[in-house]
């Protein structure tokens, strides 16, 4: 039973480390651009969009669809980068456990 107690302590320690890492992720940001930098989206590590910057050069009232496409592209790229950041930061906890989609 000694091993079981050690294992429980280890799991509790790992859980605390994971919670700390998740809190730290909230403070991290990623930035993605589209249209050669015409649209920039900044997202937090917990997938909140924090900022959207649009160059005046891309604002064309006759082509709103292009602007919408650039915003979507930059937003999706930012969220992809967040997923990569989460995998990098949290993957160390699930390494070798084969738990796809956990984070």
From Swiss-Prot:
Keywords assigned by UniProt, alphabetized: Cytoplasm, DNA-binding
GO molecular function, one term: DNA binding
GO cellular component: a single term: bacterial nucleoid
Subcellular location(s) per record: Cytoplasm, Nucleoid
Domain of life: Bacteria
Main localization of the protein described in the UniProt heading: cytoplasm
Keyword Cytoplasm attached: yes
Pfam families in alphabetical order: YbaB_DNA_bd
Keyword DNA-binding included in the entry's annotation: yes
Coiled-coil ranges per UniProt: none
Start-end of Low complexity biased regions: 1-20
Stored Gene3D superfamilies: Nucleoid-associated protein YbaB-like domain
InterPro entries from the UniProt entry: YbaB-like_sf, YbaB/EbfC
Renumbered residue ranges of the record's region Disordered: 1-29
Family matches, as HAMAP family: DNA_YbaB_EbfC
Family per similarity comment: Belongs to the YbaB/EbfC family.
Function in brief: Binds to DNA and alters its conformation. May be involved in regulation of gene expression, nucleoid organization and DNA protection.
Subunit structure: Homodimer.
Name by which UniProt lists this protein: Nucleoid-associated protein BH0035
């Amino acid at each position: 039973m000694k091993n079981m107690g050690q294992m429980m302590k280890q799991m509790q320690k790992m859980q605390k480390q994971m919670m700390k890492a998740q809190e730290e992720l909230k403070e991290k940001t990623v930035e993605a651009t589209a249209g050669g930098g015409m649209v920039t989206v900044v997202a937090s590590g917990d997938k909140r969009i924090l900022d959207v910057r649009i160059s005046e050069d891309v604002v064309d009232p006759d082509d709103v669809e292009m602007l919408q496409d650039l915003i979507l592209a930059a937003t999706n790229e930012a969220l992809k980068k967040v997923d990569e950041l989460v995998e990098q930061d949290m993957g160390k906890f699930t390494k070798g456990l084969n738990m796809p989609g956990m984070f």
